[in-house]
Amino acid sequence: MEKQAHKKFCWIIKNFSPQSERLYSVPVLIGDCKWRPIAYPIRDKYFSLCLQVVDFESLPCGWGRYVELRLTLRNQHNSLNLSIKADHCFDEKRTTWGIPIPERIPICKLQTELYQSEHVVKGDFKIIAEVDVFEAVGTLTESDISGKASELLTKKIRNDGNESGDLLKKTSPEKESNHVDVNGFQVLPSQVEYVRSIFERHPDIAVEFRAKNQHLRTSCMIFLLSLIETLCQSLEELSNEDLVEADIALTYVKDAGFKVDWLEKKLDQVKDKKEREQSGLARLHELEEYLLKLKQKCSNLDLLVEKENVELSATRTPMSFNDVV
């Protein structure tokens, strides 16, 4: 991919609140097309961002753009300073992208940050965007796996450290003598039970799968299994970065032709559980700090009571004969 353009701009958002509708920035020309970020509340609770290609209808058939994005969310008082770095592939089917924020920002917290200074207009803040746009050569085909998907797949296989690490070196079914065919997909013996279970529960999953090349079919199936394995991890092991990669993986398997609406719902459930876990951890941390302060206060009170007892005892001590005379 050849770098097409670089742009840095600032979007000032005014009067943002939980009741706000979608807020659109003025379109910004970057390369040969116009882009705009979109801000909106989710269920009146969370702050969310999107990036959209505005004039995609004027672009040639088969267009594609790869975007690297760096965002900084900041208020005038600088008490709010959040940085986001992400990337995404845009094409005719994907003209709007929900930017993955590492942690969902509760609007109540956002408003607290925005409103805490008397010198800042309520609900006003700015988003500083730095965008690099690359022209993508073609879109996903049978012989072209997207760079990001390939990178994640290779990383996943390397991290697993199992026998499927040699899979990418194999180019034909004849060389895959240790593989088993399941519904037209060559998989390892250890994966057969899982793949069969997927087809039993979701028989139409590969109805629209387009790839004929066996190497690509196998790679896509490994990618699907890796995504499912990610969702099976415990929340303690699952990071926000893992969920961002899971979003990318889901987009990839959908573009390859797998019907995975059921998996998308499961991913949303895991995201929701992760958010609840993080909120619970935050509340637990606050309670622990509060309890620690209470214990310190109790300790201080114990010392004060002990001191008062000593002083009271001294006060109650009767005077001796010598003291009186």
Swiss-Prot record:
Pfam family membership, one: MATH_2
Domain spans labelled MATH: 6-131
Keyword NAD: no
CDD domains reported for this sequence: MATH (cd00121)
This protein's UniProt keywords: Coiled coil
Residue stretches in coiled coil: 258-306
Record keyword Coiled coil present: yes
Disulfide bonds: none
PANTHER family found in the cross-reference section: MEPRIN AND TRAF-LIKE DOMAIN-CONTAINING PROTEIN-RELATED (PTHR46236:SF33), TRAF-LIKE SUPERFAMILY PROTEIN (PTHR46236)
Protein name: MATH domain and coiled-coil domain-containing protein At3g58430
